[in-house]
Amino acid sequence: IDEIRRLSTFFSLSVSDGGSRVAIIDCADYLNVNAANALLKTLEEPPKNTVFLLISHNPESLLPTVKSRCRELRLNELSKQNLFSALKQINVAIPENDKEIYSLLGGGSVGKCIRLLKYDGADIYRCILSFLNQLPNLNGFELEKFVATFSGTKNRGRLELLIELLNLSVARASKAGVLGPNLTDQIVKDEIGIFQKLCPNPNVAKKWAELAQTQSKNLNHGLSVNLDPGSMILDTFFRIEDCAKTI
């Protein structure tokens, strides 16, 4: 919320060339309730000659009152060739063996790829798939060890990425029940086989889709109110385990 309040100071400054002022909020998905409400007040009565750019990877997570005051501009993802070219231009190197993983997880976004690389996103996703492969019975000792690496203020960025990848994995599992072997763009080896085992048909896909929706909402709320990361992530995995046991 302090960052949002600093916008008032920014808007009080004069523009030397008489042009517009631009405020970029990246990423709006992680605004807590207080910050979102503070932003809403500014959006309701925006300063003159001001443009707000709210970057959101999941627009449905934004407050409806914030969304109603915005225009949606969808940006298409870059092709793999253009993505790697852009990363090369800014001297960001991707390990050759992980290029496919990062291009798919990054969804054609240069910024997202940089973030994934910063927090070892490929390894986090592989770990998630490893736990999903244990279902319907998770190894509690291994899981607690894994979850412990996301605790603490210094690991906030890794925690946010873990949540995104957890949501992605459950959503992809639900798609497997509908698309089967036609699920495209396998991110890691044996991924489709794991998802097909968890979600063999459209009826089961409905259960995973419902879990994906609830899970995303709960985790975003947990982040916004600063719930204990360990408890929040363990609870999420146990809910996934419970869902797998009903199949």
Task: Specify the residue positions occupied by each region the protein language model found.
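Clamp-loader machinery-focused feature within the broader ASCE/P-loop NTPase space
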Residues: 1-34, 196
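Conserved strand-to-helix beginnings and helix N-cap segments that scaffold or border functional pockets
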Residues: 4, 33-37, 160, 230
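Conserved adenine-binding aromatic site and its adjacent loop/helix in ATP-hydrolyzing domains
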Residues: 9, 41, 64, 68
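Helical "lid/switch" subdomain of P-loop NTPase nucleotide-binding domains
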Residues: 3, 23, 27, 31, ...
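Conserved catalytic/switch belt of AAA+ P-loop NTPases
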Residues: 12-14, 37-53
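Charged, glycine-rich active-site and insertion segments that engage polyanionic ligands
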Residues: 48-50, 57-165, 169-247
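Short, surface-exposed loop and linker segments with low hydrophobicity and enrichment for Pro/Ser/Thr
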Residues: 28-31, 40-44, 153, 157
